Amino acid sequence: MKAKLGIAPIAWWNDDLAELSDDVSLEECLRQASVAGFTGMETGRRFPMNMEELGPILARFGISVCGGWFSGLLLDGDIEREKDRIRAQMDFFIAAKAPCIVYGETARSIQGVRSAPLDTKPRLSEQEVRAYGRKMTVFAEWCAGQGMPIAYHHHMAAAIETEAELDLLMANSGEALALLFDAGHMAFAGGNVLRVIDKHHSRISHVHTKDVRGSVIEKLDRKRESFLDAVVKGAFTVPGDGSLDFVAIIARLASYGYEGWFVVEAEQDPKISPPLDMARKGHAELIRLMADRKSVV
């Protein structure tokens, strides 16, 4: 298994909660990621979205763009409009030689609404998922044809959150719609992370190695507390600091021949969990787990 290790800037800056945003410049964020050992970073709000400006900054720290979030609206939107919306990021990512755009469906999502309890997440009918899967397939085929594939991010508090919802989307979409497997989000949603890999390994093109603190998740009142409440309480963390068995997760991915990026992505309070410390811990754990496989490139 050939693996590359990246990290997301959400540990330094949280776009949804200002209170969880450390006052760190782009250069300092990249420096800390490099010091921790990472060679890739997903984009965030402080990234200039053009390689003329960003390229020299990345080169200074030996970091490449290993993906980045796009707030999708195709569930309730039009394919042609979605093409227009993603075009600028697509051109930037092609220039950056990024592996994919992380497509997160935000239509009807409550992931950024602090007042919306977890139990009020959007729920789609089977018919709606079928129609959505068809649209996503056409859109994913177009993106790949343009030279920049998308990786679909199942996400807490969004329309495709649970294992059953993901199964239905995968069953009603084509191979062009690749999957971003996020262990933390799937575990938080009550899914069996290894079973999800078993079922959808052929579609997985990108991996977020997000861990969870089971003790925090178990105590959440889903009828009262929101996704952002859970984040503030520390539901997520890096591998080696949480409850998930990443030995089994990485072994299962390797058994199916996964090769690509493993991205540490764990939003939490930077005052309680300093980003550099967390980055070092996450990187060290992934290196430890992959050492026997001699797989990090």
Task: For the regions a language model picked out, list residue spans one by one.
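Acidic (Asp/Glu)-rich catalytic clusters
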Residues: 1-2, 31-35, 48-67, 88-98, ...
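Acidic/histidine-rich catalytic cores of soluble enzymes
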Residues: 41, 133-243, 293
